[in-house]
Amino acid sequence: MAEKIKIGTMWLGGCSGCHLSIADFHEKIIDVMEHADFEFSPVLMDTKYDEIPELDVVIIEGGIVNDENREFAEELREKAKFVISYGTCAVYGGIPGLRNLWDKDEVIEEAYINSITTPNEEGVIPSEDVPHLEGRVKPLGEVIDVDFEVPGCPPRSDVAAEAVMALLTGEEIELPETNLCEVCPREKPPEGLAMDFIKRQFEVGKPEDDLCLIPQGLICMGPATVSICGAECPSIAIPCRGCYGPTARVEDQGAKMISAIASDYKVEEDKTVDPEEVAEQLDDIVGTFYTFTLPAALIPMKIQKEGK
């Protein structure tokens, strides 16, 4: 019998949800275990961080949030022959990346001094026992070389299991490259996706059956999101939030979404609605269009003016 492949997993700046998707491989985990042994996984096994063995493959969840994350990422890159960036936090920075809208010191002050849920009358900032924050959250691939990326918050277990099995058996790994709209069952109106207004989900109530959510006033990130999920959320009338990130052809998910909406206003047809008025209805543009991918955007953080 051929020697089994040695697999490890690690979480960095993530929530462990991606590890739960690995646990949700269900019976497919049996197929994986026929080809591989899990040698290291602080989340799924009772292993210590200082016992990282030599690995054939390591699956890393989470982006680079603090100096400890960076150190582990660099060591895992040295110990593993093949690195998989697993989940949207690892691939794009994820929701923790919205921290990039503030300076590091502002974040620390808000967490330990200003927060009403953290009694700290003496104003003590933990320093010795708490890893130091990086200047900004970064995707894993910005710190170490990554061999393969599996986005998702968390990745679909069936898709992830197929990708891991393909890797273990030497088959070619293929993930979808189309955007979500191309597989969504909802119909796009012939006049385009122009929005006369923007509404929150509770304001719309139950959306019209089978009609695209965008012309109904709901921000759906489908035009700027890769179709790995199979359009599960829009299929049940829940707008896509973009948790799988953009397609391989798109460099900036938020910019792509803004472009997709703006280019469909059909101003040349004397549309009466001013696009700027619609945009003003968005309370949080960055939080809406870059929920999961700000650290990987063309501008990955708030630009600080000199002297501020």
From Swiss-Prot:
Spell out the InterPro entries in the cross-references: Hydrogenase_assoc-protein (IPR051349), NADH_UbQ_OxRdtase-like_20kDa (IPR006137), NiFe_Hase_small_N_sf (IPR037024)
Stretch forming the signal peptide: none
* Enzyme Commission numbers on file: 1.12.99.-
- Cite the GO molecular-function annotations of the record: iron-sulfur cluster binding; oxidoreductase activity
Would the keyword Oxidoreductase turn up in this protein's UniProt record? yes
What keywords are assigned to this protein? Oxidoreductase
Disulfide linkage:
none
What is this protein for, i.e. what is its function? Part of a complex that provides reducing equivalents for heterodisulfide reductase.
Q: How does it assemble?
A: The F420-non-reducing hydrogenase is composed of three subunits; MvhA, MvhD and MvhG. It forms a complex with the heterodisulfide reductase (hdr).
- Similarity-based family: Belongs to the [NiFe]/[NiFeSe] hydrogenase small subunit family.
The identity of this protein, by name, is F420-non-reducing hydrogenase subunit G
Question: To which species is this protein native?
Answer: Methanothermobacter thermautotrophicus (strain ATCC 29096 / DSM 1053 / JCM 10044 / NBRC 100330 / Delta H) (Methanobacterium thermoautotrophicum)
